[in-house]
Regions:
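Sec-dependent bacterial lipoprotein signal peptides
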Residues: 1-19
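N-terminal leader/targeting pre-sequences
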Residues: 19-150
Length: 150
């Protein structure tokens, strides 16, 4: 029951976090933990900022042994999580995160591409640990979901 409550609070926080970044309606993308980060959950809300896209992340955790303060690298790749392509946009001008009271980490980034372009194409979002924490992909989420795009 406690885990369900934590999950509910996590999703509510992620949704509200995305709403504060833009007056336009955002798109929520679930982040799936990789094998190196089993048991963790995450979400990113994409907001339309005109010619840019704002991204508000919330993740429940990182692999044990990750260096603190937690630094994460984020990328928008061409392709899907199952069939990844090259990096289309690296969002690493800052890599810091903020520890949340409800057992998780929040951070935000921006990409120099319109949200409509991301929704129309086949792109995925990758969250990677810092080099001193193994430089491993810990989450991935496909931007184009059922009902969106073609």
């Amino acid at each position: 029951m406690n885990r369900r409550l934590s999950l509910a609070v996590l999703m509510l926080t992620a949704s509200l976090f995305g709403c504060t970044t833009s007056s336009n309606h955002g798109v929520s993308v679930p982040l799936v933990a990789t094998r190196q980060n089993t048991g963790q959950i995450g979400n990113v809300t994409l907001a339309d900022w005109g010619k840019e896209t704002g991204l508000s992340f919330f993740i429940s955790g990182a692999p044990s042994g990750a260096s603190l303060p937690l630094r994460l690298f984020t990328f928008i790749n061409k392709g899907s999580c199952q069939q990844p392509g090259p990096v289309a946009y690296a969002m690493n001008d800052r890599v810091t995160t903020e520890r949340q009271a409800i057992r998780g980490w929040a951070f935000s980034r921006s990409a120099p591409v319109a949200l409509s372009v991301l929704l129309a194409g086949e792109y995925s979002i990758v969250v990677r640990s810092a080099p001193d924490s193994g430089n491993i992909d810990i989450f991935c989420g496909d931007i184009r979901q059922k009902g969106l795009g073609k």
